[in-house]
Structures are given as C-alpha cells and as structure tokens.
Amino acid sequence: MNINKIALIYNHNSKHLAIIEEIKQLYNYCKIEEAEVIIVIGGDGELLHNIHRYMHLNIPFYGVNLGSLGFLMNPLDTKKLLQNIHESTVSILNPLLMQVEDTSGQIYTALAINEVSIFRKTNQAAKFRIEVNGIERMSELVADGALVATPAGSSAYNLSASGPILPLESNMLCLTPICSFRPRRWHGALLLSSATIKFEILNTNKRPVNATADFQEFNNITNVTVKSTKDKPVKLLFNKNHTLEDRIIKEQFGG
C-alpha cells in the first residue's frame, strides 16, 4: 500500500504526550479530509470513537496502541510507523445497523462496529421476545440483557458474556444472552450476517431496558432491530505480522 498523505488523531489529554510528540516530529501530516490513512493513537475506545466520527470519509484507519488491550490496534514502533503502514494488510469490517424505538414512540438509528447490547435499567431482570428474520425464535428471555456482536466484536463484550469468538471472514453474527435466568441453559445462537434480529421488550413499565450501539446509549426502549450493513464498510490496517485474524485465533487459545 503506497501512502503519501497521513492524518494523525490523538487525545490531547493523553499521559503519553511525549511519545506522541516524538511521532509528530518524525512525519508530515495533512488534514483528515485530505488523508489516505487516518492514524489513531490511543486504545480501542479512541479508535472506535474516531471510526464513528470519520467513517463517512471512507479512509482506512491505522491504530497505534498506547492503551491497555488494544485489540484493534497495532504495537507502537515510532521509527517504522510509515513502513508498517505501507506493508499493512486491510481488514474490512461491516458494522451493525441498530434501530430502536423508545416508550415515547421516538425512533433512532445507530451503527456499531463491535456490538449492539440491550440491558436492564433497574434491579429487575429484563424480559424480551426474540425474532430472527420475522420468525419468533424465543417467546420470552429473562436475563440481564442480550447482545449481537460482529466477528470483530466477538472477542470483546461478547466473550466476557461467554459468547463464542468468530473468525473475521465467517459472515456470522453472535446472539448472546447476558446472565440468562430463563431459559437458564440457553447460551445464545450463531446467525448468518444477513439475519435481521428483533427484540421486543416485555413489561417496559416495570422492567425498563436501555440499548447501546458500541458507546451510543438509548433509554427506555420498547423494541430493537439489528442487522449487518455493507453500505458503510470500515477499512482497518494491521501490520503484516500482526493481523486481526491472527489475533482472533490467538484469543481462542487463551492468548
């Protein structure tokens, strides 16, 4: 990948400003709108926020990890930064499109790179009905919540909720309950990425529920519809010896 114009994004309150200044001195940068690659320095959260902010530009993102986990990031190598970008591999992520309706009848939409999650708002467990492609698959799930994860997001919140990790090219989605009470033995489902999943919230007055698409939260919802969309693909760049697919495989073996 031959790259000449790069943009740099970082948190100006970062505790790593000395390292960031070193990177700034080594390379020339342009405005984000003129860039061929957007470099995001920080952690997964910083990268996700900026993907949501700039994904409409259809410019590849290259993350440099100065956070803790950095699953979607590349290791820091200031001297070889440009070389690593030139030699990088591209992973295409298709986000989830979430549509929610709240108790006032307002309808909202949002995109998620990792997952869409719904969860109880009070100490009362949530109750909801689940449809897949217009067919009722579960008349009542009683749980703290549930989530739908992409392959890229399957190793994040989904894994913590005991969901499976999906290979990046699997064209699948994870539907995973969060602390399921009834049915107690239900551990979720693997669905084709073409599936449309709908959650209808039951007893919303007594058991209010919120929904999130990555970090965007919506309160007091009555139903949620989730599906994958190929209309807004996100390109992530990874070092050739540190690909996202390799990391997903490694995570499955306790790496």
UniProtKB/Swiss-Prot annotation:
Essential cofactor(s): a divalent metal cation
Gene Ontology cellular component annotations, sorted alphabetically: cytoplasm
Keyword Translocase: no
Active site: D44 (proton acceptor)
Reactions this protein catalyses: NAD(+) + ATP = ADP + NADP(+) + H(+)
Pfam families: NAD_kinase, NAD_kinase_C
EC number from the UniProt entry: 2.7.1.23
SUPFAM superfamilies according to UniProt: NAD kinase/diacylglycerol kinase-like
Keyword Nucleotide-binding: yes
Main location: cytoplasm
GO MF assignments: ATP binding; metal ion binding; NAD binding; NAD+ kinase activity
Alphabetical keyword list: ATP-binding, Cytoplasm, Kinase, NAD, NADP, Nucleotide-binding, Transferase
Residues involved in NAD(+) binding: D44, G45, H49, N114, E115, D144, A152, S155, A156, Y157, N158, L159, S160, Q216
Localization annotation: Cytoplasm
GO biological process assignments: NAD metabolic process; NADP biosynthetic process
The family this protein is said to belong to: Belongs to the NAD kinase family.
HAMAP family: NAD_kinase
Function, in words: Involved in the regulation of the intracellular balance of NAD and NADP, and is a key enzyme in the biosynthesis of NADP. Catalyzes specifically the phosphorylation on 2'-hydroxyl of the adenosine moiety of NAD to yield NADP.
Official protein name in the record: NAD kinase
Organism: Rickettsia africae (strain ESF-5)
